[in-house]
């Protein structure tokens, strides 16, 4: 056990929601973050969004949709991505322990989703210099994206795991600003339909275990993954 990254000992309040508008979920995150700063519980929201593109703070103009599709600007890290049906989105609203280690927090989120993939029979891992969870190949294929914000020692935003989503939605953008890699889903990799509901409970358990140190962070890099350019 590597120890919890959370400043609170009580269990994480996991909320399994349905389909929630992106802006509505964003407002809920802010309200929960305010409550957490005031001494409230750590919370994990698990949900789906109606189809929407969201742009992190580092998104450049040429990475936006080529057809002029509207984009919601956010205050998370990272660049542009897509959310929509068939994708499980997780928003941990967590008070981090001192000293703050955001990289360690991101690694724990990655580890939880790597474990979910392993439970399904997929050998996923990391690509050096890039966040998220990847499947090996040339090019490597991203199955889960991560983009977070930490304010007042409290986390917002989180991760998106592609279960059975429309991968064509990613073709209108440069996903996460990475042009030399591909995007995939659990269904595409396994050759069967993997619904959001199938993995909800597994994801919730893995995220809580990783944040509490029960699931240690490993050095998992998929073979034949393409390293990031220097």
UniProtKB/Swiss-Prot annotation:
The keyword Protein transport does not apply. Substrate binds at residues 76-83, 145-147, 158-160. Its EC number is 2.3.1.181. It catalyses: octanoyl-[ACP] + L-lysyl-[protein] = N(6)-octanoyl-L-lysyl-[protein] + holo-[ACP] + H(+). SUPFAM superfamilies: Class II aaRS and biotin synthetases. The active site is at residue 176. Its main location: cytoplasm. Keywords: Acyltransferase, Cytoplasm, Transferase. GO terms for biological process: protein modification process. Disulfide bonds: none annotated. In the reaction, the free carboxyl group of octanoic acid is attached via an amide linkage to the epsilon-amino group of a specific lysine residue of lipoyl domains of lipoate-dependent enzymes. Catalyzes the transfer of endogenously produced octanoic acid from octanoyl-acyl-carrier-protein onto the lipoyl domains of lipoate-dependent enzymes. Lipoyl-ACP can also act as a substrate although octanoyl-ACP is likely to be the physiological substrate. This is Octanoyltransferase. It comes from Mycobacterium bovis (strain ATCC BAA-935 / AF2122/97).
